Amino acid sequence: MIFSTFEHILTHISFSVISIVITIQLITLLINETVGLYVSSEKGMIATFFCITGLLVTRWIYLRHLPLSDLYESLLFLSWAFSIIHLFTYFKKYKNHLSVSAITAPSTIFTQGFATSGFLTEMHQSPLLVPALQSHWLMMHVSMMVLGYAALLCGSLFSVALIVITFQKAIRIFCKNNNLLNALFSFNEIQYINEGNYFVRNTSFFSSKNYYKSQLIQQLDHWSYRIISLGFIFLSIGILSGAVWANETWGSYWNWDPKETWAFITWTIFAIYLHTRTNKNFEGVNSAIVASMGFLIIWICYFGVNLLGIGLHSYGSFTLTSN
């Protein structure tokens, strides 16, 4: 009872804090002079990370197994993984962290929000593990898969953002004075040239906009590649450990179960992405298109197959059936 109450409190605290963080970040995206609010939002994300960590540890203690046995617990773990990626980019002092946090922070809150919504209420009290899940491979296989999903989803969203920014016609900036623009574009000042009775704006302003856009695209491409590479490693380890576990449980390394099939498709898509990165002609938008396709494939693999209620890995209608 105590653990259940503590879990309930942590769930609501984490969701409330991260909701405030999202509101603050929307304000900072529109009004860039609110430095204090930006710092507060990062402190809020740190607090959210510890709340979700406490929530997972609490379930681990009173359930006596790693909380990865059903959809609710895996969503909590996915939200926790998103928050790790967010904090990693923050502590790395990434100069365009605000743009990255516009992806990682909402990913955390939407995942956390769905996990704690009424749809999964019956899963909050996890039943005893079925025999197939009572294995030390549960921690290895599922944790690697979910970490892989989190990294690949974030990397794919960076690629989607890259495509949107590349093809948008103009960057609109909301500010109160030119000093903000100067700081944002890393230029000392916007110069004006007086020619007779006319004031001609120096083209450095327009160049600075293009420079900022180019730098942002390069950074998104850089982080997308790094995070997807990390996620691909996690996914590969998860698939291999799952094959070993399946052989111990069912006597076969691979059964072409729907979940296994879509995991293989996901792995193939991102293998193609990483292969395209070896050719400089395919960097940027071309590789980002492949990663964007992977975003949809991941959700089908992770979530869609479970809702169909078929296969060995399915959670059915939010009810655990087997591994």
Curated annotation (Swiss-Prot):
Subcellular location(s) of the protein: Plastid, Chloroplast thylakoid membrane
Keyword terms, alphabetized: Chloroplast, Cytochrome c-type biogenesis, Membrane, Plastid, Thylakoid, Transmembrane, Transmembrane helix
Role description: Required during biogenesis of c-type cytochromes (cytochrome c6 and cytochrome f) at the step of heme attachment.
Protein name stated in the entry: Cytochrome c biogenesis protein CcsA
Domain of life: Eukaryota
Species for this entry: Cucumis sativus (Cucumber)
Family of the protein in this entry: Belongs to the CcmF/CycK/Ccl1/NrfE/CcsA family.
Alphabetical list of InterPro entries matching this protein: Cyt_c_assembly, Cyt_c_biogenesis_CcsA, Cyt_c_biogenesis_CcsA/CcmC
Principal location listed in the UniProt entry: plastid
One Pfam family hit: Cytochrom_C_asm
